[in-house]
Amino acid sequence: MGLSARNQLRGTIHDIQIGDIMAHVVVKVGDNLIESVITRNSAEELHLKKGDSVKVVIKSTEVMIQKD
């Protein structure tokens, strides 16, 4: 999938908490932790779980998660 966002970092899901509507995802990139809040539906569609390899996509207005 091509993206216009240039800030893409590979990492591993360090923690994920899925709520009724939203999911809080913590991704470890090197020695850093990056947090993102995404919809529950997105987390379920991507089958996100702790330890998954993902790509963090950072835009000026949001931080997205893409599963590798």
Please report, for each region that a protein language model flagged, where it lies by residue.
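Non-catalytic connector elements of ABC transporters
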Residues: 1-68
